[in-house]
């Protein structure tokens, strides 16, 4: 696999993380520090790279079992997180219980949900016998960079437009989950 192909693959895999990070940045409001941007982007990048490695090591032997339910895991996680964001957006402006993209549990859930495709890609890379270190590190670094941009962009955009960004973000997460489910059920 040529490096440009690896780069394009990494960009494609990071699009779900971009959507999540834009939403996270919008929710952060005045708490969008460099450290928080790095935290969100790092978790999303590490999960993308890590799931690629896990998928690669599982290889061909487990492909049929993983592919049977990976889309349900991603759908369920994104539906839950999106639903929570929508629910929180309808409540009064209290800070307790609001969607918090810095909460470790929420961030890990988002990391898993947005990197399920990387698991399948890892399995495919094992089939192709592609060099794992190059693939996984490129996927992780690209996802980190795109996610960092997403958090920053979401924060700047969210400050200029006073919308219910929790509601929009929740709908985006549910949309991503639904897209993953439909693709796997009807187009794979």
UniProtKB/Swiss-Prot annotation:
Regions crossing the membrane: 2-22, 40-60, 66-86, 107-127, 133-153, 167-187
Any GO molecular function: manganese ion transmembrane transporter activity
Keyword presence, tRNA-binding: no
InterPro entries linked: Mntp/YtaF, Put_MntP
Highest taxon in the source lineage: Bacteria
Keywords: Cell inner membrane, Cell membrane, Ion transport, Manganese, Membrane, Transmembrane, Transmembrane helix, Transport
Cell compartments where the protein resides: Cell inner membrane
Pfam families recorded: Mntp
GO CC terms, sorted: plasma membrane
Membrane topology category: Multi-pass membrane protein
Membership in a protein family: Belongs to the MntP (TC 9.B.29) family.
Record function comment: Probably functions as a manganese efflux pump.
HAMAP family documented for this protein: MntP_pump (MF_01521)
Name of the protein described by the UniProt record: Putative manganese efflux pump MntP
Biological source species: Parabacteroides distasonis (strain ATCC 8503 / DSM 20701 / CIP 104284 / JCM 5825 / NCTC 11152)
Top-level taxonomy: Bacteria, Pseudomonadati, Bacteroidota, Bacteroidia, Bacteroidales
């Amino acid at each position: 696999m040529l490096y440009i192909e690896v780069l394009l693959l990494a960009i494609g895999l990071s699009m779900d993380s971009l959507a999540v990070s834009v939403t996270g940045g919008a929710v952060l409001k005045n708490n969008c520090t460099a450290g928080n941007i790095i935290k969100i982007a790092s978790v999303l990048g590490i999960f993308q790279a890590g799931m690629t490695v896990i998928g690669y090591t599982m290889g061909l032997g487990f492909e049929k079992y993983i592919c049977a339910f990976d889309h349900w895991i991603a759908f369920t996680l994104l539906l839950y997180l999106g639903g929570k964001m929508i629910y929180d957006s309808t409540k009064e402006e209290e800070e307790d219980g609001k969607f918090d993209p810095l909460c470790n549990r929420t961030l890990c859930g988002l990391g898993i949900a947005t990197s399920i495709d990387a698991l399948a890609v890892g399995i495919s890379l094992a089939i192709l016998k592609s060099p794992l270190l190059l693939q996984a590190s490129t996927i992780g670094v690209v996802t980190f960079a795109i996610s960092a941009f997403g958090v920053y962009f979401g924060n700047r955009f969210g400050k200029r437009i006073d919308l219910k960004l929790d509601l929009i973000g929740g709908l985006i997460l549910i949309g991503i989950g639904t897209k993953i489910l439909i693709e796997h059920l009807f187009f794979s």
